[in-house]
Amino acid sequence: MATASPAADGGRGRPWEGGLVSWPPAPPLTLPWTWMGPSWGQHPGHWGFPALTDPSASPAASLGIFEVRRVLDASGCSMLAPLQTGAARFSSYLLSRARKVLGSHLLSPCGVPELCSISTRKLAAHGFGAAMAAMVPFPPQRYHYFLVLDFEATCDKPQIHPQEIIEFPILKLNGRTMEIESTFHMYVQPVVHPQLTPFCTELTGIIQAMVDGQPSLQQVLERVDEWMAKEGLLDPNVKSIFVTCGDWDLKVMLPGQCHYLGLPVADYFKQWINLKKAYSFAMGCWPKNGLLDMNKGLSLQHIGRPHSGIDDCKNIANIMKTLAYRGFIFKQTSKPF
């Protein structure tokens, strides 16, 4: 797996290929919102304001984010001024003012770049104002919505055949804000092996009472279609794509069970993003242990119970949000059926 590199593309990633990108582009910035996320720095892991970084600067000569703010405020250079005069030029404004005010103080990656990694909620909490907190801290994605999906299915040791979906969760993730806007979540009654095995219950946390009397897969698929229509996801002008942790859910499990039951597979299930591949493009390593490795690699806390479909979806969404904040542009990884 390869990552986008500054040298390979003139210092900028290519959003249509998926990878880390340098943002914003050269001024003037024409988008209606301001991206304060990553730009290529002078060493791996450096996010934002590379021009403020001098690799020869000693730690003693470095100023942290709050020291920078204090010095700027004391000099009458409000860090909110760019919001009133053109937020798109925020970084260049801060660069010029910081250089004038701070003089010989050189800023290290633990200084001003910290401004870029702080969340918009924290910006508001630290007094940077609601206007800054409201800015969207992500580069534009190729899709309006990401549909995060993670099935749980009947299982045992040795494996039973055919496996049947017993939990069907979907999170609708806004591609601009990377926030969850809607949730579809249903349990499914298995019909070939209606009795869950102890192994299955221990692995997934799903007990027999949670699937007894629930709709069949055919009925659940009909409700998924109704939900998709209600959420505006079937509009041809709305671009959406499913996201899974691996290819199993939509390449193996759903088409396999639908084939067994003689059910059609909707076209929207035939393209997806494999988060493992996206993560490997962004981070340069393959997550052998799936969500656990991805959360660890991004210093994220695992949400909920492993192998709970809905909790796994929340973890996927959180990982996607973190990668997007770092400048990753998601693209389809599945091949056409």
Curated annotation (Swiss-Prot):
One of its GO terms (cellular component) is plasma membrane. Binds 2 magnesium ions per subunit. Highly expressed in the brain, heart, thyroid and testis. Expressed at low levels in the muscle cells, liver, pancreas and kidney. GO terms for molecular function: 3'-5'-RNA exonuclease activity; metal ion binding; nucleic acid binding. Mg(2+) 1 binds at residues 150, 152, 312. Its EC number is 3.1.-.-. InterPro entries: 3-5_Exoribonuclease (IPR051274), ERI-1_3'hExo-like (IPR047201), Exonuclease_RNaseT/DNA_pol3 (IPR013520), RNaseH-like_sf (IPR012337), RNaseH_sf (IPR036397). The active site is at residues 152, 307. It comes from the Eukaryota. AMP binds at residues 152, 307. Its cofactor is Mg(2+). Keywords: Exonuclease, Hydrolase, Magnesium, Metal-binding, Nuclease. It comes from Mus musculus (Mouse). Mg(2+) 2 binds at residues 150, 249. It is an enzyme of class 3 (hydrolase). This is ERI1 exoribonuclease 3. Pfam families: RNase_T. The gene is Eri3. Interacts with PRNP. Residues 146-320 form the Exonuclease domain.
